[in-house]
Amino acid sequence: MDPGQITFLADLVALRRDLHAHPELAFAETRTSDLVADELTRYGMQVHRGLARTGVIGVLRQGSSERAIGLRADMDALPLTEENTFAHRSRTPGLMHACGHDGHTAMLLGAARLLAEQRNEATFDGSVYFIFQPAEESEGGAQTMVAEGLFDRFPMDAVFGLHNWPGIPVGEMAVVAGPVMAGTCAFEIEVQGSGCHAAMPHQ
């Protein structure tokens, strides 16, 4: 990697670790949204705030096309106590980024920075909306953003999101035609034992 790529990667790692150390629950992602807005402003983007309380939208336009896409990441953490001992472990008792939303937020900031830095290199023609969504963890943050006018204010031809998946080898990705991980349901069980991610109880 060239020096610029090394610096870029180091900056993303630092962002992710900062976010991991400061988890916030659904609709209370105030520090996180401040950090996101500051970064997007630093990249030279228009920044819009207030959708779903703590949502942030970064706008990057280039060329004359009316085409537009959205890139989306979630920001909220979970009410869990982190037992890790590394330096960037959660500093908030009882809260933890246990589902990777710190990574999602850092990755989307990385994409925003990369496209902003290359905006004069004809990388795209149209608009890219960077959507930082609060309250993904069963709190309806996406639905709230839509109900409050996300697509009315920022019309898009398509929206793309992703989710980290540790079981996929580094450098590979899985793609599904249509919705994936788009459902939620609630139930209660009582388990005695070590905690885990509900999607991977066997691990």
Region spans (language model):
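Acidic/His- and Gly-rich active-site-bordering loop/insert found
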Residues: 2-97, 102, 106-125
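Histidine/acidic-residue-rich, glycine-tolerant segments that coordinate divalent metal ions
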Residues: 56-57, 78-80, 84-96, 102-103, ...
